Amino acid sequence: MAKQSMKAREVVRVKLANKYRAQREELKAIISGVNSSDEDRWNAVLKLQSLPRDSSPSRQRNRCNQTGRPHGFLRKFGLSRIKVRETAMRGEIPGLKKASW
């Protein structure tokens, strides 16, 4: 199990990313825009750098919904590989069965 503080930190990152999403997209559009002047681009870069670090979506980490485990995460189920196996063996995931050949 992951520490509660790590799970809470991840929740804060998601909230910050949602809060600053529009502002971040506007600034990136100015930076990558062909019609923007160099001065406007530079000011947009400075504003982008002044945003909170955790507001960047790339700082988010996929974690297991049950345990908070960051590695072995399966997006389809929202669980780690260990929890997917446990729930599949109990038959709690519809349509998923153990492979045999």
From Swiss-Prot:
Pfam families: Ribosomal_S14. It comes from the Bacteria. InterPro entries: Ribosomal_uS14 (IPR001209), Ribosomal_uS14_bac/plastid (IPR023036), Ribosomal_uS14_CS (IPR018271). GO terms for biological process: translation. Residues 49-70 are annotated as: Disordered. The keyword Cytoplasm does not apply. The keyword Ribosomal protein applies. One of its GO terms (molecular function) is rRNA binding. Part of the 30S ribosomal subunit. Contacts proteins S3 and S10. Binds 16S rRNA, required for the assembly of 30S particles and may also be responsible for determining the conformation of the 16S rRNA at the A site. This is Small ribosomal subunit protein uS14.
